[in-house]
Every structure is written in C-alpha cells, then in structure tokens.
Amino acid sequence: MPLADTGVNIMTASLGRTPRRPNPVFSDEYEVVRAVLIGARRDAGLSQRALAARLGKTGSHVAMIERGQRRVDLLEFCRIADSLGVSADALVCRIAERLGALKRAA
C-alpha cells in the first residue's frame, strides 16, 4: 500500500518522526498574551534590553518572546510581571478581558 493511501505524511515518515501539531505560540490566544506583555513593557517605559537586564537575560531572549518565537511558562510570566512593576494578577486580568473580547468577536 503506498504511503499516500495510508494517511502518513511522506516527509515525516521518511525521517521516522510523527507529524507535528500546530505550534500554540502562533495561536490567536497566545497573540493576546504577547500583546499584553509588550504593552506592559512599554507602559513601564522599558526597552527590551532593559527588561532583559532586570530578568538577567539577553535582549534577544525578550525579543524572541515578543515575536512569538519563545513561549513563556508561568514562573517566567510572574518574573516578567515583577520586573515590570505590575502584578501577575493584573496581567492575567488584562489577558482574560482580551480573550473574552476575542471569543465574543468570533
């Protein structure tokens, strides 16, 4: 039976890998998270480099987060909020409000 008839992706089958799921970093919902983080950084009057210095990271680390090339886990989210001088709760509320608006618009 040819691979095309089995539903197997020929590119991934030949490499011995399973097909990848869509990257959640590029979802509309995660775009909201990124937008809130970028807005909070700008509201704090910080450049990417200045925020990175507060986090003990490189400027490219923050840039990758903001471009959606790196996902933020909960602990890093809390550290970012603290470095911006805002509570993680406040950022989560902003995210929840925008996600609600996104859902209503759909």
How would you describe each model-predicted region?
Residues 42, 53, 82:
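Alpha-helical residues within the helix-turn-helix
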Residues 1-44, 87-93, 98-106:
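N-terminal flexible/basic segments that precede or flank functional cores
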Residues 64, 68, 79, 97:
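Alpha-helical DNA-recognition elements
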Residues 75-90:
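DNA major-groove recognition helix of helix-turn-helix/homeodomain DNA-binding modules
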Residues 45-67:
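Short alpha-helical DNA-recognition segment
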Residues 35, 45-46, 72-75:
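Residue-level signal for the short linker/turn that defines the boundary of a DNA-recognition helix
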Residues 58, 69, 95-99:
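The DNA-recognition helices of helix-turn-helix-type DNA-binding domains
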